[in-house]
């Protein structure tokens, strides 16, 4: 679609053909809208886009017969070859007698709009964009002009494409007029809203330095901090974006002035308080049943500081799949639960669930979990040896599962590997897992500062604290030849945690009386089959 602003043109201009304007033409006093045209390309050209670095394309660019609409068509091509030469192409347009505020008929954008867009990092070149912008401002370019399609002015474009260099140039030329101007396409938000919603950290910092209002509200009554994307909604492949979102939101929240006369230093800060002390002050502990917002029931799995936001947060495994994650946010795992059953919330949002009285309604009883280690025929000595081994190796506090040497694990919710070491080290205090990764994405071969803790290929070794390690399956080297018992162990490991009263051993049940022995012989095979099928 084309748009011609005929009333804006003078009678002398209407006599000239729009396809060509002489470079000797005197500058017009009023801007016009140029009709759209296709981008010119050399004959037998191998590419579909215009490359100003190509000699044949340079000849077209410098040819006076190349019209302003054709040059606008070249600028519209969103490729680095064109955008890096925005200052040269813009100068050629001005040489052809174009008014500094003339518009492209296809996009309704001015040269200043295109210059701000061309400053985008990656595709454009901020230095070239600043050169053209300075030239346009000296010629009297109007910063307040908006594209009729997007309702964005030059400052909005610079904020949208995260070009702090251009923002400084524009605000220096016309700071009061456009600093807090709004845009209808972004819910009547300011340039700060536009930058915040697109995670443009550099643009937000620049706007704050020049006095932009961090408390300005859009048509939805949102301040810029409210439109920052939620890090918890980002997948594992967007860990960097999650970190930017966290920093950006905190920056905007800190910039909002306090609504009371108390200095910020008097506000409480719980970031340095351990999570267990925070829970103890509330009469809670990990594993307790809690209510979130007095509505959603779940189990408390985590309490402490996080990477996605400041302050103390609790991680809850909901009973129903009404959550947002599986216990990990931005590639960092805080606890383990099924997908869509994990959720994070401030400590103030949870309360202890009331104790449920035992129900008198008769229903089909659930199969109680049996401690199969007591029916495998192992003696007391073997049990003690196994228990001692478990204590000598690290354990992950997740449903009471032990992580042993040789187990397949997941490090930081991302990298798979096998546990080769657990214990204290010389390079850091506390207990550490030494893990041989499946891929060479580690840091060493099992030795740190000349001390060898385990042996693996170069770049396959990594150390991690127990909080960053989760078990993926049974031990790497099976401890028993009984395949059935191994399968039962793996099945019961993945079941939800249940709390029962003390389960009596088969021996205790059988020793009560003859009737108990008969019931036991009938009940135990059925129980074993049911547990294995589940």
Curated annotation (Swiss-Prot):
Per the UniProt record, one Pfam family is CAP_GLY
Question: Which InterPro entries does the UniProt record give?
Answer: Ankyrin_rpt (IPR002110), Ankyrin_rpt-contain_sf (IPR036770), CAP-Gly_dom_sf (IPR036859), CAP-Gly_domain (IPR000938)
Instruction: List the GO biological process terms.
Output: cytoplasmic microtubule organization
Taking every annotated instance into account, which residue ranges of this chain make up the domain CAP-Gly? 304-346, 423-465
Instruction: Map the ANK repeats onto residue numbers.
Output: 107-148, 150-173, 187-299
**Low complexity composition bias: which ranges?**
358-367
| Stretches the record annotates as Disordered | 1-33, 349-391
Where composition is biased (Basic residues), the residues are 377-390
Q: What does the record note on quaternary structure?
A: Homodimer.
Name listed for the protein in its UniProt record: CAP-Gly domain-containing linker protein 3
Q: What is the scientific name of the source organism?
A: Xenopus laevis (African clawed frog)
What does UniProt list as this organism's lineage? Answer: Eukaryota, Metazoa, Chordata, Craniata, Vertebrata
């Amino acid at each position: 679609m084309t748009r011609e602003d005929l009333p804006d043109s003078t009678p002398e201009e209407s006599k000239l053909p729009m396809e060509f304007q002489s470079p000797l033409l005197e500058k017009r006093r009023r801007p016009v809208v140029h009709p759209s045209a296709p981008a010119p390309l050399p004959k037998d050209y191998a590419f579909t886009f215009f490359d100003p670095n190509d000699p044949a394309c340079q000849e077209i660019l410098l040819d006076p017969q190349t019209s302003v609409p054709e040059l606008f068509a070249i600028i519209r091509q969103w490729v680095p070859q064109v955008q890096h030469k925005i200052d040269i192409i813009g100068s050629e347009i001005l040489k052809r007698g174009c008014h500094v505020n003339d518009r492209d008929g296809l996009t309704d954008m001015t040269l200043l709009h295109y210059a701000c867009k061309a400053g985008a990092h990656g595709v454009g070149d901020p230095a070239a964009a600043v050169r053209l912008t300075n030239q346009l401002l000296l010629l009297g370019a109007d910063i307040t002009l908006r594209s009729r399609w997007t309702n964005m002015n030059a400052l909005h474009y610079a904020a949208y494409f995260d070009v702090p260099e251009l923002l400084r140039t524009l605000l220096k030329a016309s700071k009061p007029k456009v600093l807090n101007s709004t845009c209808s396409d972004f819910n009547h938000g300011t340039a700060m809203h536009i930058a915040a919603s697109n995670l443009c950290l550099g643009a937000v910092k620049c706007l704050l330095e020049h006095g932009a209002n961090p408390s300005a509200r859009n048509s939805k009554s949102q301040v810029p901090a409210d439109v920052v994307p939620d890090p918890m909604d980002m997948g594992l492949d967007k860990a960097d974006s999650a970190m930017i979102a966290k920093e950006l939101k905190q920056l905007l929240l800190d910039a909002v002035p306090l609504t009371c006369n108390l200095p910020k230093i008097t506000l409480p800060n719980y970031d340095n308080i351990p999570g267990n002390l925070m829970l103890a002050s509330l009469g809670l502990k990990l594993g307790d049943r809690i209510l979130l917002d007095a509505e959603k029931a779940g189990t408390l799995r985590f309490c402490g500081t996080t990477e996605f936001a400041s302050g103390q947060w609790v991680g809850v495994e909901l009973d129903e799949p009404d959550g947002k994650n599986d216990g990990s946010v931005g590639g960092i795992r805080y606890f383990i639960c099924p997908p869509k059953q994990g959720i994070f919330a401030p400590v103030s949002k949870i309360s202890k669930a009331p104790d449920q009285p035992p129900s008198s309604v008769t229903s089909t009883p659930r199969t109680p979990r049996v401690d199969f280690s007591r029916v495998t025929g192992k003696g007391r000595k073997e049990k003690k040896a196994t228990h001692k081994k478990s204590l000598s190796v690290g354990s992950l506090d997740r449903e009471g599962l032990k992580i042993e040497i040789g187990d397949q694990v997941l490090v930081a919710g991302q990298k798979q590997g096998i546990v080769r070491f657990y214990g204290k080290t010389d390079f850091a205090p506390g207990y550490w897992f030494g893990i041989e990764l499946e891929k060479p994405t580690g840091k060493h071969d099992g030795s740190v500062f000349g001390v060898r803790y385990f042996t693996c290929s170069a770049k396959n070794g990594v150390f991690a604290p127990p909080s960053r390690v989760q078990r993926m399956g049974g031990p790497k080297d099976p401890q028993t030849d009984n395949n059935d018992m191994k399968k039962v162990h793996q099945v019961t490991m993945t079941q939800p945690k249940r709390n029962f009263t003390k389960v009596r051993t088969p021996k205790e049940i059988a020793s009560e009386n003859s009737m108990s022995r008969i019931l036991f012989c009938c009940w135990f095979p059925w129980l074993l089959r049911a547990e294995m099928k589940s």
